[in-house]
Every structure is written in structure tokens, then in C-alpha cells.
């Protein structure tokens, strides 16, 4: 669920030179990216391993030549089954902290690091709720300070 006020947040956050806004997650990329993904994308370095992984479910893109190129690159990597599938890595052993592969999320994170893409701080979360069905169960125990909380209350009370 997205708050209607996200439009003004994005407009105020993105500079004229930026073409995307990506949401940074809390997990390290090395914990949720299989080794073959790093190797086949040319990203098998500590800068990629030790960065926080992005959340691939929520992102904002401006339609520009550069964004189309980046998204096409993302799609092409996603079409390579050796990179996207959960199959065990064959080119090298997994990193010691590896837990699971996050597929398109792992690929997007590697591309964002490679291309130096814009990443939002946690303020972005004030305007989104990924688990809005669950939100209605837990909202009486929330502080309700986010913009999205106010919007969801309006919907619930309508």
C-alpha cells in the first residue's frame, strides 16, 4: 500500500539528475546473494558483499534513456537462470554467512552498486506498507506516526 503523499516525497527527494529511488533494506548482500550471482555479474568483491541489500519490491523510476538501460540490464540478468535461480552455486563455494538467495533483489542490489544508483534513507518507509493486511491486525499497538499509517486509518474508518 502506498500513501498518496509519496508523490511529493519523491519529487522533493530526487534531484533532476537522478532517475531512480531505491529502498535500502537491513540485510547484508553477502547473506542473501549466492556466489554464482556475484561471479556471473562481475561483482565478486567485498564492496558488493558488504553492502546492505535493497528491497526490490518498492522502487521509483523516471522514464529516461538511462533508467531504461538499467532496467533492461536488470531484466537480462534476471533471464540468466544461473544468476536468478535458487540452485546451488557451481562456480565457487558460497560465502560463509550465506543464508539464501534473494533472486531479483540480489541482482538489483549488485546493479545499484555497479551503477551508483540513488538509495533512499528510511524516510521512504513512512509512505509505504508492504504488509498492509497484517497492518490492520497490529495497528492498535503501533505508534501511528507514519504518513501511511494515517492513510490506512482513513481507509479503515471509511
Predicted regions: what is each one?
Residues 1-158:
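Glycosyltransferase catalytic domains, chiefly GT-A lineage
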Amino acid at each position: 500500500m502506498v500513501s498518496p503523499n509519496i508523490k511529493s516525497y519523491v519529487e522533493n527527494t530526487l534531484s533532476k539528475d537522478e532517475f531512480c529511488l531505491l529502498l535500502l533494506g537491513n540485510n547484508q548482500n553477502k547473506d542473501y546473494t549466492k556466489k554464482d550471482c556475484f561471479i556471473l555479474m562481475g561483482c565478486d568483491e567485498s564492496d558488493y558483499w558488504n553492502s546492505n541489500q535493497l528491497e526490490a519490491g518498492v522502487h521509483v523510476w523516471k522514464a529516461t534513456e538511462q533508467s531504461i538501460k538499467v532496467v533492461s540490464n536488470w531484466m537480462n540478468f534476471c533471464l540468466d537462470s544461473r544468476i536468478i535461480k535458487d540452485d546451488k552455486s557451481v562456480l565457487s563455494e558460497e560465502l560463509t554467512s550465506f543464508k539464501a538467495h534473494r533472486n531479483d533483489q540480489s541482482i538489483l542490489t549488485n546493479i545499484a552498486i555497479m551503477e551508483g544508483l540513488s538509495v533512499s534513507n528510511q524516510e521512504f518507509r513512512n509512505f509505504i506498507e508492504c504488509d498492509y493486511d497484517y497492518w490492520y491486525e497490529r495497528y492498535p499497538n503501533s505508534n501511528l506516526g507514519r504518513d501511511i499509517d494515517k492513510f490506512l486509518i482513513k481507509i479503515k474508518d471509511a
